[in-house]
UniProtKB/Swiss-Prot annotation:
Compartments it resides in: Cytoplasm
Stored PANTHER family: PREFOLDIN SUBUNIT 5, PREFOLDIN SUBUNIT ALPHA 2
Keyword Chaperone recorded: yes
Chaperone keyword on record: yes
Protein name: Prefoldin subunit alpha
Primary localization: cytoplasm
Amino acid sequence: MVEVSEEDIRNLAARHQEFQRQAEGLKQQMNMVQASITSCDQATVTINELKTVSAEGKTAETMVPVGFGSFVYAEIKNADKVIVDLGAGFSAEETADEAVETLKRRKEQLTKILEQMSASLTKYIQGMQALEVEAEKLQQPSQA
């Protein structure tokens, strides 16, 4: 029978905790990426709705934040131009159609990143499961 040391069990537990910690961190990052995807979707819907209203010759009424939870009512008279965040603190003016395309590309990139993160999370979970199986095997001889 193989002798199992307390150090072996501690090492196994430490490895399991590390996998668990990494998996939790990855889940938090995945939630942030998912929130960005949702934000892209919301921006796309809003731009398209504003384009429709503008094409009908109407103005859209909205509320603009002025700070500290305060808003003023404003009318959007021209939805043909959109300021799009390019990242790293830079923005650019684009047509509404270009902005929708930019958001579509960004969403595709974020979706790929989310898929990669999901694959990594699966590996962490499989690693934890393998360690749990190993721990069960180590405990069985001592119970017999």
